[in-house]
Design a protein with these regions (language model features):
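A short glycine-rich, Lys/Arg-flanked "PGG" loop and its adjoining helix->strand segment in the class I
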Residues: 129-141
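Class I SAM-dependent methyltransferase SAM/SAH-binding core
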Residues: 50-52, 56-103
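Conserved beta-strand signature within the Rossmann-like core of class I S-adenosyl-L-methionine
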Residues: 142-150
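Core SAM-dependent methyltransferase catalytic element
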Residues: 182, 188-214
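Short alpha-helix
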Residues: 166-181
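A short SAM/SAH-binding and catalytic strip from SAM-dependent methyltransferases
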Residues: 114-127
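A short acidic, Gly/Pro-enriched loop at the edge of an enzyme's catalytic core
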Residues: 105-115
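Conserved class I S-adenosyl-L-methionine
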Residues: 1-43, 58, 62, 159-163
Length: 214
């Protein structure tokens, strides 16, 4: 695992504890994680994959199973979460980086064919807009972004509680994603009979003038 320095933050302190119970508890409310991978596999067969907010590595394991030949990079701010991820993914084609995602990962080269955010962007407060911009810069022309995340809730008390847990639930992600990428999938789903909604988005980066999509 490679590491770069990351500043201390409330989010890091939050996951210092939650890393120990994350895999045992998140199945009950982080819906759509397998579906977004399944839907992404319909539109791309990526050679280079980036997951932002890879956490304990659950999606990294699924990505490796679906795309066995791909080079995979996982980025997260939490050292305890990355330590768990490192125990799950031990192949030479997977790299883990500890860093904030406020700027692109790659400095030069081909870029990534797929960037995945799984219940990450709604916790980047502030920073979600910069993360979307960084993902756009990290993607190769014609590359795809896949996002599954909380959307919104009509219940103010629930929104406030999620805010205590660093989650912003205002439906703010989807318009920006649809503006920045060509939408291939853009859906909202109810959870627990409408207590909240979550969203699934897959979009494609358009080639700039003079660039070609292979």
């Amino acid at each position: 695992m490679n590491a770069t320095a990351a500043p201390n933050s409330a989010l890091e302190r939050y996951y210092q504890f939650h890393s120990r119970i994350y895999d045992a508890t998140r199945w009950s409310f982080l819906f759509g994680r397998e579906e977004i991978l399944r839907r992404a596999a319909r539109v791309t067969q990526p050679r280079r994959i980036l997951e932002v907010g890879c956490g304990t590595g659950r999606n990294l394991v699924s990505l490796r199973r679906r795309f066995p030949q791909a080079e995979i990079t996982g980025v997260d701010l939490s050292e305890p979460m990355l330590a768990i991820a490192a125990s799950k993914v031990r192949d030479e084609r997977t790299t883990l980086l500890r860093r904030c995602y406020s700027a692109p990962v790659h400095e030069s080269g081909a870029g990534f064919d797929l960037v995945l955010f799984s219940y990450a962007l709604s916790m980047f407060n502030p920073g979600w807009e910069q993360a979307i911009e960084a993902a756009h810069a990290d993607l190769a022309p014609g590359g795809s972004i896949a996002v599954v995340d909380f959307s919104h809730s009509a219940f103010g008390g629930f929104r406030r509680w999620m805010g205590v847990n660093h989650v912003r639930m205002e439906g703010h992600l989807w318009p920006r994603l649809a503006q920045k990428f060509v939408p291939l999938l853009d859906e909202r789903r109810p959870a627990y009979r409408g207590v909240w909604q979550y969203g699934l988005f897959i979009g494609r980066k358009q080639a700039e003038c003079g660039e070609s999509v292979s």
